[in-house]
């Protein structure tokens, strides 16, 4: 249920994970979706690492996609870098019970058609991934929502045992 990282057969630019020279927003969305699962299952997932981290922007590199690229004078951060930064800077101490209810009545999904090394089977995955946690020191409630699809999704959000909470800030990547 946590796997949004799946190769697509769409002809749209930057939809395949192996066709670019650098990380793109599709990579970053897939990573963010996966990381909501890491955080939601923090009692099981003790550690996660991102590799490879650095690649030479103008030279030979071992991997097709890295988190950051460098030259002699510059450091280029990819969308994946900013997703990692968001999850690092805004992680709670414990998970908060929550529920999303969708205006459509059911959770939206995405379907990918397999091809090449993945076989011919199609795969359906969730479009929305989320996690809610709380910072013990500040009392902040941290809500991370990833829409891995192209369409807007309307939903209501409820937090167990919490009423009258005011929205203080919205941060996005």
Question: Whereabouts are the PLM-identified features?
Answer:
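Proteins with a high burden of low-complexity, intrinsically disordered sequence enriched in S/T/G/P/A and R
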Residues: 1-12, 145, 168-173
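Short loop/turn motifs at secondary-structure junctions
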Residues: 44, 166-169
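Aromatic/acidic polysaccharide-binding cleft in carbohydrate-active enzymes
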Residues: 2-129, 137-138
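Carbohydrate-binding surface patches
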Residues: 123-167
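Composition- and surface-driven signal marking solvent-exposed, interaction-prone regions
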Residues: 62-71, 99, 145-146, 154-161, ...
């Amino acid at each position: 249920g946590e796997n949004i990282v799946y190769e697509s057969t769409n002809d749209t630019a930057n939809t395949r994970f192996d066709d670019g020279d650098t990380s793109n927003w599709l990579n970053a969305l897939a990573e963010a979706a996966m990381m909501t699962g890491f955080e939601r299952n923090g009692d099981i997932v003790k550690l996660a690492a991102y590799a490879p981290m650095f690649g030479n922007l103008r030279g030979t590199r071992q991997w097709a996609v890295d988190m950051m690229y460098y030259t002699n004078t510059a450091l280029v951060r990819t969308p994946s870098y900013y997703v990692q930064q968001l999850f690092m800077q805004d992680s709670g101490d414990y998970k908060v019970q929550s529920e999303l209810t969708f205006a459509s009545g059911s959770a939206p999904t995405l379907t990918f058609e397999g091809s090449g090394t993945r076989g011919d089977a199609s795969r359906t995955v969730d479009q929305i991934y989320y996690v809610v946690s709380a910072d013990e020191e500040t009392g902040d409630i941290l809500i991370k929502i990833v829409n891995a699809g192209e369409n807007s999704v309307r939903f209501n959000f409820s937090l167990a045992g919490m009423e009258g909470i005011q929205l203080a800030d919205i941060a996005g990547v």
